Regions:
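Multi-pass alpha-helical transmembrane bundle typical of ion/small-solute transporters
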Residues: 1-319
């Protein structure tokens, strides 16, 4: 087994808990919201864990021991110090108060150069804009032939449930191929088999805790949106979020904020529903969208603060 330092272990554990408690709700939240009343949390945990283990082990095999899917190619491994572990600690605090923080910015900012951070920011801004525009256009089309608030016919319900489980599985795998890098950054870039087994156990336990807590406070971002508890709406959100993430996954290996893509998708959807269906007044949507956007800015501000603290105060001659 690789020699692990204290700060490497602390940073990894904090990042693993924070990422699973914060970002995983983006991908599993709508699925949880629409299944909580008919499926036990242990069943959902087992299903999500199966996809999680496949994503980890496939990435490890396909990328020569690198579970980050090559997302850390431009962020070389460096000895983990206390200030690196500070980032996921801050993320943990923000998560507990329900702030949808960009884990990629907050965690990777402690390791990446300013050049890489600039590329991450530009890709994430593009992700928010593309997701919002895409969602607005898609839900404009959906509103032409489908009323999401109308109950699903009993004969169709089983097909929507199956479709949701399939789309959530693909979305969960695609998201993991993006955001596992936020945890793997604390680890050697090539993992041994015994270390991979230990990491898998930590991830599965963290996922169990998240399901037991029903997503925590971050889940409120999903629950307060229009009809997200309905299986049909949840399936459509998961499907188009998967399309957006897969596009950016294939675009290049620069890390990005999946949080920004998710919030952008929900913003575009809410605006489309308000504009084209009359279910909500458009002016009532802007405070909701604005609140989520401001919370994202809090996370970005914390990330910038960490960068300045490390590169200008703690290690002024570093990256």
């Amino acid at each position: 087994m690789e020699m692990l330092t204290l700060w490497m272990v602390v940073g990894f554990l904090l990042a693993a808990y924070s990422v699973i408690a914060n970002d995983s709700v983006q991908t599993l939240g709508t699925w949880m919201a629409s299944n909580n009343e008919r499926v036990s949390y242990t069943t959902m945990w087992a299903a999500a864990s199966a996809v999680l283990l496949w994503a980890l082990w496939y990435g490890w095999y396909a990328y020569g021991g690198d579970i980050s899917y090559g997302r850390l190619n431009k962020i070389p491994f460096q000895e983990v110090q206390w200030y690196h572990a500070l980032a996921p600690g801050i993320l943990l605090l923000l998560t507990r108060v329900g702030v949808p923080v960009s884990t990629s910015f907050l965690v990777l900012s402690a390791f990446a150069s300013s050049f890489v951070l600039e590329k991450m920011l530009m890709k994430s801004i593009m992700g928010y804009a593309v997701a919002a525009t895409f969602a607005y256009a898609v839900w404009w089309l959906i509103s032409k032939w489908l009323d999401e608030a109308k109950p699903v016919e009993e004969s169709h319900k089983v097909w929507w449930i199956r479709a949701q489980w399939v789309t959530t599985g693909f979305l969960w795998w695609t998201w993991l191929s993006h955001d596992v890098a936020n945890i793997a950054v604390f680890l050697p870039r090539t993992l041994t088999l015994d270390l991979l087994i230990m990491i898998s156990a930590v991830f599965v336990f963290g996922l169990y805790w998240m399901f037991r807590e029903k997503g925590g406070r971050i889940q409120n971002i999903i629950l307060e949106k229009h009809n997200t508890r309905y299986v049909r709406s949840a399936t459509l959100i998961d499907l188009f979020y998967f399309v957006c993430l897969y596009f950016f996954k294939e675009l290049n290996d620069i890390p990005m904020s999946t949080t920004w893509v998710f919030v952008g998708l929900l913003a575009g959807r809410e605006l489309a529903i308000a504009t084209f269906t009359g279910k909500k007044k458009t002016k009532s949507v802007f405070p909701l969208v604005g609140k989520d956007f401001m919370k994202m800015m809090v996370g970005l501000g914390a990330s910038v603060g960490i960068v300045l603290l490390i590169h200008m105060v703690i290690v002024p001659n570093g990256l």
